[in-house]
Amino acid sequence: MSDIVASFSSISAVNIRPHFTDSAWSEYQKIVAEGNPTLARTPSWTFAELDSLVICREMPIKLNFKGNKKFVEDVVFRVNKKTKKIESLAYKLSQNTEKHIMAKEWNERDRLTLITFLEDYRTAYCLRDIEYINKVFSNDAYIIVGKVLQQSKKKYNDNTELINQDGKVVYTQYSKEEYLVNLKKSFMSKEFVNIRFEECNVGKGYNAKEGIYAVQVRQLYYSNNYSDDGILTLAIDMRNDVNPLVRVRVWQQERDVEYTAEQMIERTVSTEGSISSN
């Protein structure tokens, strides 16, 4: 990892490309292309094993955008034990979210697998990676999008009329195709997207629903032209954990007892993985 750290902290003549698989190098290029990153501080590494990987946490980088907008992201590297190559990388979850998941009385593999998925999910939105989002949402995903209307003004002659009620939330259900079309348009209008997960509540299915996870987090969304603060609930089918699928994605401004993590498993995802509209 020292070569990679050096590439951020100074002008390094070391070729770091051999440390990455092709797919991981592509992910790395997306990260270094975002916000002119520099090393925020000397990394303090911790390590965990997940199947064939060693998870290396974390390298803090500072991102700088127009308007003096700055963020620090901790980058997680997942290294193959045998080849010693980095197979994937992502932005780390918040300490509170990670701590909550690790406190669950599940086996360590389940906890680390869920954390890894959420890191990838969050990173995809931060990097505006439509390809990943398309891959990870099931074709029949149940998607509810909430948008906080911002106050806007439009002039008619010399009069100014308020068009939208500031703070009003509009909820819309979309198909996967509709959601991705709108999301792509939204991403194209943004210089950056910064998403944080807090106040995490997670649950997992058992017996016939083993491998189904539900996650409810407070999502703090901030970009150069839009921001909101709400509750994101996901139902994730990880029965094939190599190719996990988001089967439910619901955003609400306030926490709703209809969409707790546990109830999401029981009420929305059937044992066959199909979606119920009830």
Task: Specify the residue positions occupied by each region the protein language model found.
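A mature extracytoplasmic/lumenal domain signature
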Residues: I61, A90-L93, F137-D140, K147-V148, ...
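Short, well-ordered alpha-helical segments enriched in acidic and aromatic residues
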Residues: M1-V32, R128-Y156
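Loop/turn elements at helix/coil->beta-strand transitions in domains of secreted/extracellular proteins
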Residues: R128-E131, V193, V242-N243
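Conserved small-residue-rich
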Residues: D110-T172
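A compositionally biased, intrinsically disordered/low-complexity signal enriched
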Residues: M1, F8, I16, F20, ...
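Surface-exposed, charged secondary-structure patches
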Residues: A24-K81, N157-D228
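Short, low-complexity N-terminal intrinsically disordered segments enriched in polar/charged residues
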Residues: M1-S10, T83-L127, K135
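Short beta-strand edge/turn micro-motifs at domain boundaries
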Residues: K66-D110, Y206-A214, Y222-N278
